Design a protein with these regions (language model features):
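The substrate-binding groove and active-site-proximal loops of carbohydrate-active enzymes
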Residues: 184-188
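N-terminal accessory/pre-domain segments preceding catalytic cores
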Residues: 1-170, 178-182, 192, 202-203, ...
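Loop/turn residues immediately N-terminal
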Residues: 215-216
Length: 272
């Protein structure tokens, strides 16, 4: 059992560090019980109910989740880390990596705290496999560009419409292409392009989402949600830049494939 673990008193920093390793190593069982999860929460001064729900739901991935939780030191990061874990799905909790969680905990801030939690720090956009895309875009896009896009998000809409070519044959029935993959290839199916836009926006602290009901890509501002059109319309000279016209082609508007119409679309999901 857990005998011999003393509660923290006074300057118990060193004792706590020694215990941390033994506590981490004690979680070698397949799944975490409610009791063990609550013990862990008390040790790390985390919200017991939330921690228990999350760790029990994470099943065989509880070591990764506990490792992440153990790194949350300040009150602010404890609140933020638990919020992040509650934004993602139960399936995410079962297979997310530490790298992904750490990446999104370091998201750039935006003014509206609620928008930040839901549409910036939240890594989950749609049905994609979660990746550490925030750090990737931080390196790929200069700070100046990121700030320009944040000041005028429609510039990012225009950039994606002009630079990411849509080819719906390039990813038939597979998992969405990762944001990093779309950045490198500059071509994607429409759904992967939409996820790419939202991921890139979030990495620049621009609140964005794919509307769960309509499937439309939206920027989230103080006045609410605004649909954006990421398709390239070469006949409209508004966003035209040098040399874009020659490459442009008319893209028919694309309806996202509903999972019901196409069961293969979700075939990469596992049931457990």
């Amino acid at each position: 059992g857990w005998g011999g673990v003393t509660p923290d008193r006074g300057g118990a920093k060193d004792r706590r560090m020694v215990h941390e390793d033994s506590i981490r190593n004690a979680y070698v069982s397949m799944f975490m019980t409610d009791e063990t999860a609550r013990y862990f929460a008390r040790r790390y001064k985390l919200d017991e109910d939330a921690v228990s729900r999350i760790l029990v739901a994470s099943r065989g991935n509880h070591r990764v989740i506990a490792d992440f939780m153990a790194r949350l030191r300040s009150e602010k990061s404890k609140r933020g880390g638990l919020d992040l874990l509650q934004r993602i799905s139960a399936k995410d909790l079962r297979d997310v990596t530490l790298e992904v969680l750490m990446d999104h905990m370091q998201s750039r801030m935006c003014k509206n705290a609620d928008h930040f939690r839901r549409y910036v720090r939240n890594p989950r956009v749609s049905n994609e496999i979660l990746t550490p895309y925030k750090g990737f875009f931080k390196k790929a896009v200069s700070k100046e560009d990121a700030e320009a896009y944040k000041a005028e998000p429609m510039k990012l809409v225009a950039w994606v419409a002009q630079n990411i070519r849509v080819d719906n044959d390039c990813n038939l029935g597979g998992a969405p292409i990762s944001p990093e993959g779309v950045w490198k290839a500059r071509v994607a199916d429409a759904h992967s392009r939409d996820i790419f836009f939202v991921s890139m926006a979030r990495s620049m602290a621009i609140p964005a989402r794919i509307n769960g009901v309509t499937g439309k890509v939206q920027l989230i501002g103080d006045d609410g949600a605004m649909d954006v059109d990421l398709n390239h319309h070469p006949e409209e000279p508004v966003f035209m830049a040098e040399g874009i016209a020659s490459k442009g082609k008319l893209v028919a508007s694309y309806k996202p494939i509903r999972s019901l119409d196409n069961p293969k679309y979700y075939s990469h999901f596992t049931l457990s």
